[in-house]
Structures are given as C-alpha cells and as structure tokens.
A protein has these predicted regions:
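Alpha-helical transmembrane segments of multi-pass membrane proteins
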Residues: 15-18, 77, 108-113, 149-153, ...
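Residue-level signature of the transmembrane alpha-helical core
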Residues: 12-13, 62-66, 107, 111, ...
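Alpha-helical transmembrane segments and their membrane-interface boundaries
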Residues: 8-11, 15-20
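Loop-to-transmembrane alpha-helix initiation sites
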Residues: 143, 159-166, 180-192
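Interfacial segments of multi-pass membrane proteins
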Residues: 50-54, 76-80, 108, 125-156, ...
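A cytosolic-side transmembrane-helix exit/cap motif
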Residues: 122, 146-150, 182-189, 206-213
C-alpha cells in the first residue's frame, strides 16, 4: 500500500479505537466490583480511579492508559514510513515531510479516550493517554510536560491544575522545540491541548467556585460529587 495518506487514515481509526479502551472502568470492575463512573467525578481516568477504587486500580489505569497511547504511535510510525512511503522512520520526524501524519495518530488516540465509542462517546480527560502518545512521539517534550504536571500538582494539590498546565504547555512546547514543523503537526498538537482543556471544563468551574477536590491517596468516595 504505497498511499501514506490512506495508511495514516487507517492508523488513525485504529488508534481511535485503541485509545477508547476504558481501562479505568474495566479495572475498577475487575478488582473492586465497582463502576467508577457512579462515584466521585464519574470519570474513567486515573484520578477518579484513585478516589473510588484506590491506589492499585489507579496505578494500573495510569500505566495502561499511557501504554495504549504509546503503542498507537510506536506502531504507526514505522508502518506509515516504510509501507506508505518506502522510506525510513526519519520521514516522520518533526519538520520532515510526514510529521503531520504522526500528529494525526496522536490526536486520534487522545480523542478516542475522551470520546469513547464503547461508552456512548463519553470517556476520560486525555491526560494519561496524552502522556503516552507524546512520550512515544518525542520523549523530551513528554518528560518536560510530566515535570510541569508534577510541580503544579505538588504546589496546588489539584490534579486538574497540573493537567491544564500540561495541556496548555503541549502546543507551546511543540512550536518552541520544532518551529519548522508542518502546520498540520502544530494543528494536531494544538487540538490535543484544546480538547484536553475542554474535557476539564467541569473541573475549571469547580476550581473557580472552590469546590474542586484535592489529591488524596487515602480518602475514598462512594457517592457522586456535587455538581
């Protein structure tokens, strides 16, 4: 198949469905016989898994959500480059001809997590899967955003603040590190950041009202948060 655009579209669709796998929900049911959507924030991500199902489920959710994002990129990069172009993976590097194609795959995996077709197009907020795709795409940016997240959470005790900082920082970092990358790649990185911020709209409202829950490794919740 020497059609890189078609192959990119196929990889994006596959990445969307891989990204959509709701590991937080699956693990909560497996280990705690709990539907984590029915307590806390109702989210299927790591933070709500921690609040509802505990550290074990949260750690596994974080790991698997990161891995599913990374796997999408690690598979798509050589596949699109070698099969679609007939060139080495350097064709997918930022600034090269095919850089935007990997950006599409990254975006598709994050959108799959946030708009999961397995859950009527409801899902998580995209932080863990986003970390996975960015680490696989260009790990120095991934690590810098992770550091930004950790510092913000350590200072404020709000996971949502760290998540928003990382989401806003992604397109800025991508443009700063790779100013000569394609507009397509920049657009994809910007859309990841914008979508993750949008997914945190309820958290933003709670932060402004002083109702956002702070990070706790010991406190469990069994009821939905007040809206």
């Amino acid at each position: 198949m020497h059609n890189p655009i078609l192959l990119t579209a196929i990889c994006a669709v596959v990445s969307f469905f891989i990204g959509a796998i709701p590991f937080g929900l699956i693990l909560g049911r497996m280990f705690n016989h709990t539907d984590i959507r029915k307590a806390g924030s109702g989210n299927i991500g790591t933070t709500n898994a921690l609040r509802v199902a505990g550290p074990k489920v949260a750690a596994l959710t974080l790991l698997l959500d990161c891995l599913k994002g990374a796997i999408c990129v690690l598979i798509a990069r050589p596949l699109i480059a070698s099969v679609g172009y007939g060139f080495p993976v350097s064709i997918m590097a930022p600034g090269a001809a095919g850089d935007w194609m990997l950006g599409v795959v990254c975006l598709a995996a994050v959108w799959g997590h946030i708009f999961s077709p397995y859950l009527n197009f409801h899902g998580g907020k995209g932080i863990a899967v986003g970390l996975g795709v960015i680490l696989a795409w260009y790990w120095p940016i991934g690590l810098s955003l992770l550091g930004m997240f950790i510092v913000a959470v350590a200072i404020t005790k709000y996971v949502s603040v760290g998540s928003l900082a990382a989401a806003i920082g992604l397109p800025i970092a991508a443009c700063a590190v790779f100013p000569y990358s394609s507009l397509g790649l920049k657009f994809c990185m910007a859309m990841i950041g914008i979508t993750v911020v949008w997914a945190h709209r309820a958290n933003i409202k709670k932060l402004t009202c002083g109702k956002e829950s702070k990070l706790s490794f010991t406190k469990r919740v069994t009821e939905p948060d007040d809206k």
